[in-house]
Amino acid sequence: MRDCDLLVALDVDGTVLHHDGHLAPAVLDRVRALDALPHVHVVIATGRSVLSTVPVVEQLGLAREGRPAVCSNGAVTVRTDLTNGTGYRLVDVVTFDPAPAVALVRQELPDVLVAVEEIGVGFKVSTPFPPGELWGEEIVVPDEELLAHPATRVTFRDPSSTSQEFTELVERIGLHGVSYAVGYSAWLDLAPEGVSKASALEQVRRHLGVEPHRTVAVGDQRNDIEMLTWAARGYAMGQAPAEVVAAADRVTGTVDEDGLAEALDEVLAELA
């Protein structure tokens, strides 16, 4: 059984990387040890855009031709392409109409910052975001252009609010026709309805021919809940909110304690 294909899905921020972007040597060592096994598929599954995912894949030494990665909380799936200059090729893109949800949120927070992802470019934004929060080009555009086309992801940011206030806002207004996740700061991501890291990983699993009971996932935030439930073994990082811990099978150390290395040690010993 240990020789059967195994899929290991890893969140990035707060899991692979520390919140300051640091990659711990212990984590890098365990990821590469797993990736060296021919029957193990290490797959990045992140809320990051494609542009900010590719450098992480490269930093981990995972940039092998055809390797899948799940980006934008499941709305965008890519495979490594070492021939076209971008480092990736698009495999699946799911979009939705962002206008109704943006109107609802703005009724409650008229000054909220809004960003709409532009694959391979960056983001169209209503107002510039705090420095360092968005990867790629930020293009300030009027609302008619911001909301004119179907989107893979819409991000709301209110530097004066808290994560709890955003959670209460979502529960109060009701958001229909979309999937959503509140970040650890006052950050709200919208994705197409029914789309999550889990939905994209299920397609990856089937393509790779991995059996459902041979799946592992590690994550730390609310956008990881579906992925942790989907996996046969889900690990929550030690700093994860209570609802994320509840969705997991096991809890590992915090990101500051290199908890991912601890979890992958278990995977190497018990499953791989």
Task: Give the positions of each predicted feature.
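Short, hinge-like loop/turn segments at secondary-structure boundaries
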Residues: 60-63, 86-89, 131-135, 197, ...
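Asp-based phosphoryl-transfer active-site loop
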Residues: 4-21, 44, 228
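Conserved acidic, metal-coordinating active-site core of Asp-based
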Residues: 108-218, 222-224
